[in-house]
Design a protein with these regions (language model features):
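The Walker A (P-loop) glycine that initiates the GxxxxGKT/S ATP-binding motif of P-loop NTPases
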Residues: 35
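Nucleotide-state-sensitive switch-loop elements of NTP-binding domains
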Residues: 2-21, 26-31, 39, 43, ...
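A generic "cationic amphipathic patch" detector
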Residues: 58, 110, 146, 169-172, ...
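Class I SAM-dependent methyltransferase SAM-binding "motif I" and its flanking Rossmann-like core
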Residues: 138
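Short, glycine/polar-rich helix-capping loops at beta-to-alpha or helix-loop-helix junctions
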Residues: 67-71, 145-149, 173-179
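Canonical P-loop GTPase G-domain recognition
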Residues: 165-192
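Flexible active-site lid/hinge loop adjacent to a nucleotide/diphosphate
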Residues: 128, 143, 147-167, 177
Length: 192
């Protein structure tokens, strides 16, 4: 039952709090980004990195079940990238972040983006020590998506609607999507 998970989360949360203090001491903004596969996350990170180039120094930790091209695509943008392959684990945890942090030039960064594993079920309960949680909602995934993953959307500080250029093609109902977000993530800042 549940009792098995509680100690694991306790240890994780303690470590996450340590990370949080460490990040704060370095004035590092840490963003934990959640999305389903194919919702445009890596592309979005790429664009963000390009936009901020020369002004804000970004590092990225990419979580993935298996190695894949995400990290390669990002490292081409001259951004320090550390890939964490989680194997059978469907989420990143604070311990994995601790390992990745050792390989990241944290003193040279302003922003650390953690691209969580592409799935919205598991990661919601694992605190990584981030300052901001962003969850992506691609118009191609449908407006009821937040209702399917309430814990994830509820834990988000920011909900980002992606692939808006396809909204008409997929018949995306913006009002329904905003209503769904409002229902499960009423405190989240919605960006379209």
């Amino acid at each position: 039952g549940m009792d098995v998970h509680v100690p694991v989360l306790d240890a994780n949360d303690r470590l996450a709090e340590r990370h949080r203090g460490f990040f704060a001491a370095k004035n590092l903004v840490v963003i934990n980004v959640f999305s389903s596969l194919g919702s445009g996350e890596t592309c979005l990170l790429h664009m963000t990195a390009e936009m901020l180039r020369g002004r804000v120094r970004i590092g990225v930790i990419v979580g993935d079940l298996a190695t894949d091209n995400d990290a390669e695509r990002l490292s081409r943008a001259d951004i320090p990238v550390v890939q964490i392959t989680t194997g059978t684990m469907c989420h990143l945890d604070a311990r994995m972040i601790a390992e990745a942090m050792k390989k990241m030039p944290l003193d040279d960064l302003d922003v650390l983006i953690i691209e969580n594993v592409g799935n919205l079920v598991c990661p919601a309960s694992y605190d990584l020590g981030e300052g901001v949680r962003v969850v992506l909602l691609s118009v191609t995934e449908g407006e009821d998506k937040p209702l399917k993953y309430p814990p994830m959307f509820h834990s988000a500080d920011v909900a980002l609607v992606t692939k808006s250029d396809l909204a008409d093609a997929v018949d995306f109902n913006r009002d329904a999507a905003l209503a769904a977000l409002n229902k499960v993530a009423h405190h989240a800042h919605v960006i379209e």
